[in-house]
A protein has these predicted regions:
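Alpha-helical elements of Rossmann-like donor-binding domains used by nucleotide-donor carbohydrate transfer enzymes
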Residues: 17-20, 24, 37, 61, ...
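Radical SAM [4Fe-4S] cluster-binding motif and immediate context
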Residues: 68-205
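A residue-level signal for beta-strand positions that form part of recognition/binding surfaces
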Residues: 37, 47, 61, 93-95, ...
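Conserved, mostly hydrophobic/aromatic
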Residues: 7, 38, 62, 102, ...
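Conserved residues at the C-terminal ends of beta-strands
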Residues: 12, 41, 65, 112, ...
Length: 205
């Protein structure tokens, strides 16, 4: 009601959903009911949910961001932040997010759609159709949604930083992961590889 121009919203991870939406729009289709992970405006009942979108289990399968499609120089011009001496003095800072989801369920958090707990809060406890079968997000037998927090490999994350350095001469990385140090094994491996690649000397974080 507040935004009458809004036809639908994407719930949770958008990579696969946006790809399917693009195909629909390209084909001039106005029927989005078979695209998972949407909330669609419905003239009769207000809105309706399509089937939940399964969480991406392998984050290494997600391509690195196409930074070259952005006007990066405008971004870098105003990228320094007064959070630390390094971030304040940086000339070309970039932000990254590698981890998705959260193993916790804090009621005050605005984080949505990246974990089983998030999806349960959105869709509720009832059955939902997924393909030809009904699923319940809280069902322990259905591992599609049993991924509270996920990380790509440390190599993926380091390659992301190397790309930013080599193509855009970034000198500071803001890692916006919400639970980076909750996975100590991953964090230690990332830090070891970061130093091994010599990035600690040229890209602060």
């Amino acid at each position: 009601e507040i935004i009458p121009e809004l036809d639908l919203i994407v719930i949770g991870e958008g990579e696969e959903t946006f790809e399917e939406l693009y195909d629909k729009v390209k084909d001039n289709s106005k029927d989005f009911t078979n695209v998972n992970g949407l909330c669609i405006r419905n003239k009769n009942s207000g809105y309706e949910f399509t089937a939940p979108r399964a969480l991406i289990a392998d984050l290494n399968s997600v391509p690195l961001p196409a930074y070259d499609l952005m006007e990066t120089e405008i971004y870098f011009k105003f990228s320094s932040l007064p959070l630390s001496a390094d971030s304040f003095n940086s000339k070309r800072r970039a932000s990254t997010v590698w981890e998705r989801g959260c193993p916790r369920g804090c009621t005050f958090c605005s984080h949505n759609g990246m974990s089983r707990i998030d999806l349960q809060n959105i869709y509720g406890e009832g059955d939902r159709k997924q393909g030809e079968k009904l699923v319940r997000i809280s069902d322990k037998e259905n591992d599609t949604f049993q991924l509270p927090a996920r990380w790509p490999t440390p190599e993926y994350a380091v390659n992301n930083v190397k790309l930013l350095k080599e193509k855009f001469n970034v000198d500071f990385i803001s890692i916006l992961d919400e639970n980076m140090t909750s996975n100590l094994k991953w964090t230690k491996e990332f830090c070891d590889l970061y130093v091994k690649e010599g990035l600690d000397k040229i890209v602060k974080w």
